[in-house]
Amino acid sequence: MDAVLVLVFILSSLVFLSLWRQSSERRKLPPGPTPLPIIGNFLQIDVKNISGSLTNFSKVYGPVFTLYLGMKPTVVLHGYETVKEALIDHGEEFAGRGDFPMAERINKGLGIVFSNGNRWKEIRRFSLMTLRNLGMGKRNIEDRVQEEAQCLVEELRKTNGSPCDPTFILSCAPCNVICSIIFQNRFDYKDQDFLTFMKKVNENVRILSSPWLQVCNNFPSLIDYCPGSHHKITKNVNYLKKYILEKIEEHQESLDIENPRDFIDYYLIKLKQANHNQQSEFSLENLTTTVSDLFGAGTETTSTTLRYALLLLLKHPHVTAKVQEEIDQVVGRHRKPCMQDRSHMPYTDAMIHEVQRFIDLIPISLPHAVTCDIKFRDYFIPKGTTVITSLSSVLHDNKEFPNPEVFDPGHFLDKNGNFKKSDYFMPFSAGKRICAGEGLARMELFLFLTTILQNFKLKSMIHPKDIDTTPVVNGFASLPPSYQLCFIPV
């Protein structure tokens, strides 16, 4: 009986504390729905369609509102003007990385994606500089992507025009590009170490996209005490870091300071230079996490976009025909597509932009945090508050993109058929935390897609009108449904 009374007292105290904290915080923060004790507004959010839930809230509370995901407040930014004002006009103040408990348990604040403060600035600056250096070498990044595009074509030829699921092959190509940048070497598509490594990376992205992970991130105590797929992420990350560490040790043995070969070499040189600096952010542990981040951010996202692009091209054969006509006119059949071609291929460029806009791959981006107390649109947001941005509300703005739910490359073409830029194009987010690999990803999408369409006719297994392009998961990432197609050589 005493134990029951103690439990009731503890639960009552928690409820009271939750109510007291929420009432005092809510007086200062932007408006929002009334939260329940402990669980906040979680039951009011569709974890399978978070962006849709945010749109519904914005209709009631405006473009800046507060949700309680658990006991902590989260400020939501909805619509282009609001997102731009925060991430670009007040970029420094909104440059923090917000709460993502699952990643914090794994990365311990290291790496480039989930780090904060000076550590994040140092690692990001170094990573961007190194990618530029690798792009300006004797064998630059475009050469690597072109080489991989040809390997991709050869693998697709092996299907002999038979029906196939393109998921595996389209995952190999961008993963191999990252391998060549990080490890210097690409891998054969049948290499078992490569296949296992790629499988772990892709599996983690899929788990991170699941509704269960959204629950874990909002109630972090579940991470330690409940069974579930989140434990698989930890095992996969441990495997990836062990593999990466083995590669680092190989590089240490063969390092030539005067002739860095890849990202790891550049980092090891930086590590030697900072060896006597106790305040340095450069360590072997940070290197393994940074490399893991680069693979996680730069492989599955690009391969998913490629997979979605082919599905949309099957759904809209008239678009495919126009792209292939442009490829024939500009590139022809006897040379490889290159990045210089893009400025002469406005329809193809518009098609790729429209794929990224339409699929809305990362609907709410990763969480931001304010780095200091800030008054934003007459609301006070305390330092450290988590902020999420609805990229869906920008990419699917019906004034900038008429009929935004329709796939139409015309959204990025002017009346004369020239490519038309849009400030609303934010699939890589915006501001200080914009994706560090944006340039590489855009290069891969252009070169991989044009090379595929230069060499193959895409044949659907069903009538185009029956093709479903609805994402199967719409939590952290929007993933396309499984499908098969035939790559018919031309």
UniProtKB/Swiss-Prot annotation:
Catalytic activity: an organic molecule + reduced [NADPH--hemoprotein reductase] + O2 = an alcohol + oxidized [NADPH--hemoprotein reductase] + H2O + H(+)
Keyword field: Endoplasmic reticulum, Heme, Iron, Membrane, Metal-binding, Microsome, Monooxygenase, Oxidoreductase
Cofactor(s) of this protein: heme
Any one of the GO CC terms: endoplasmic reticulum membrane
Keyword tRNA-binding tagged: no
A Pfam family it matches: p450
GO biological process: organic acid metabolic process; xenobiotic metabolic process
GO MF terms held by the record: heme binding; iron ion binding; oxidoreductase activity, acting on paired donors, with incorporation or reduction of molecular oxygen, reduced flavin or flavoprotein as one donor, and incorporation of one atom of oxygen
Localization in the cell: Endoplasmic reticulum membrane; Microsome membrane
Binding site for heme: 435
Gene induction: P450 can be induced to high levels in liver and other tissues by various foreign compounds, including drugs, pesticides, and carcinogens.
Keyword Heme attributed: yes
Gene3D superfamilies associated with the record: Cytochrome P450 (1.10.630.10)
InterPro entries: Cyt_P450, Cyt_P450_CS, Cyt_P450_E_grp-I, Cyt_P450_sf, Cytochrome_P450_fam2
Classification via PANTHER family: CYTOCHROME P450 2C29-RELATED (PTHR24300:SF384), CYTOCHROME P450 508A4-RELATED (PTHR24300)
General function of this protein: Catalyzes the hydroxylation of tolbutamide and the N-demethylation of aminopyrine and benzphetamine. Also has testosterone hydroxylase (16 beta) activity.
Family: Belongs to the cytochrome P450 family.
Full protein name: Cytochrome P450 2C25
Source species: Mesocricetus auratus (Golden hamster)
Phylogenetic lineage: Eukaryota, Metazoa, Chordata, Craniata, Vertebrata
Gene: CYP2C25
